[in-house]
């Protein structure tokens, strides 16, 4: 899935289209190939997305691969070997970010605890790493690929055809399922003159009234359109990748849950949640105490009249109000002249 040398933007788009189709169709067995493509893309263009966005996406793909082996009841030796392969002990990828390092360590701890004391049911694990987890991952990938499309030159059908002929002689871009799906989700359009008689790769689609009234998914692509076959991650535009959506359970959770092991005993589950990373500027005590999240005005209003006000005048003996007023009034002021009359 890595781009072939010397082909250029078209090869990147083919690799991106293949990765996008793999994630959209939930082909977990091919997730490692998607990780390889993202790592090669990161090495070539590190400025497409931030470091945390890239690492969150790669960690999610790797975690799903390991979890899928557990759900398939593979031998624990195979699961632990996959864990060691995808999350090596001496990994420098997460040392730049404490949250990512914590998420990585806690996930490895979870898998090791499960191998030592397998639970009687994997329903909770399947739910945590189920469709909601995949939808959140799909959003991260979509935003990543949108940034890639912004960095690449405009799409040209002939360049795509040349790249496809280089890798698969005799094939045509109009028959590429991955490229067609990717083009629809990215909103590709081709002028009539650029197709050289091969026909438009992406035909314009009329939007239904429901699609016209629905808010558009925020995308860096100015011309991106959502067709009737849009991915599941684009059906909820209010949850944007990289903002506040839940990418559980790759980071620390606030709630405590337990696994029921096969030995009929309870064991604390070392779950973690990756998002949200930041506490929106609130102190740690504000997050744990709901009362402390009240409006600042309410707290200040309640404190009026209850806290002593320390001033320098409070240290001096009390004086009559009239005398003190005369002392504080400048001699040449109008108020002073009226008092002397």
Curated annotation (Swiss-Prot):
The modification N-acetylalanine is found at residue 2. The gene is Tinf2. A motif (TBM) lies at residues 243-265. InterPro entries: TINF2 (IPR039098), TINF2_N (IPR029400). Component of the shelterin complex (telosome) that is involved in the regulation of telomere length and protection. Shelterin associates with arrays of double-stranded TTAGGG repeats added by telomerase and protects chromosome ends; without its protective activity, telomeres are no longer hidden from the DNA damage surveillance and chromosome ends are inappropriately processed by DNA repair pathways. Plays a role in shelterin complex assembly. One of its GO terms (biological process) is telomere capping. The TBM domain mediates interaction with TERF1. This is TERF1-interacting nuclear factor 2. The lineage of its organism: Eukaryota, Metazoa, Chordata, Craniata, Vertebrata. GO terms for molecular function: telomeric DNA binding. Keywords: Acetylation, Chromosome, Nucleus, Telomere.
């Amino acid at each position: 899935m890595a781009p072939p040398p010397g082909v250029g933007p078209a090869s990147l788009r083919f690799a991106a289209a293949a990765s996008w189709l793999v994630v959209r169709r939930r082909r977990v067995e091919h997730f490692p190939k998607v990780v390889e493509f993202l790592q090669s893309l990161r090495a070539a263009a590190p400025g497409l997305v931030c470091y945390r966005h890239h690492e969150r996406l790669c960690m999610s793909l790797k975690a799903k691969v390991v979890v899928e082996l557990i759900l398939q009841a593979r031998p624990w030796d195979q699961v632990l070997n996959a864990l060691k392969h995808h999350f090596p002990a001496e990994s420098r990828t997460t040392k730049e970010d404490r949250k990512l390092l914590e998420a990585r360590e806690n996930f490895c701890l979870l898998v090791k605890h499960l191998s030592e004391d397998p639970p009687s049911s994997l329903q909770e694990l399947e739910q945590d790493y189920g469709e909601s987890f995949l939808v959140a991952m799909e959003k991260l990938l979509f935003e990543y690929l949108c940034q890639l499309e912004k960095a690449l030159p405009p799409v040209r059908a002939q360049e795509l055809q040349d790249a496809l002929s280089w890798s698969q002689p005799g094939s045509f871009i109009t028959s590429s399922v991955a490229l067609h799906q990717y083009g629809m989700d990215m909103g590709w359009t081709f002028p009539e003159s650029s197709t050289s008689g091969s026909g438009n790769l992406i035909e314009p689609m009329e939007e239904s009234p429901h699609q016209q009234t629905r808010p558009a998914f925020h995308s860096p692509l100015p011309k991106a359109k959502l067709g009737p076959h849009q991915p599941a991650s684009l059906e909820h535009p209010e949850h944007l990748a990289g903002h506040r959506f839940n990418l559980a359970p790759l980071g620390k959770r606030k709630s405590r849950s337990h696994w029921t092991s096969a030995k009929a005993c309870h064991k604390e589950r070392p779950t973690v949640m990756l998002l949200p990373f930041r506490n929106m500027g609130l102190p740690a005590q504000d997050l744990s105490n709901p009362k402390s999240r009240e409006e600042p005005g309410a707290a200040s209003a309640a404190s009026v009249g209850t806290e002593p006000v320390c001033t320098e005048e409070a240290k001096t003996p009390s004086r009559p109000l009239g005398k003190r007023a005369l002392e504080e009034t400048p001699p040449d002021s109008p108020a002073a002249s009226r008092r002397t009359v």
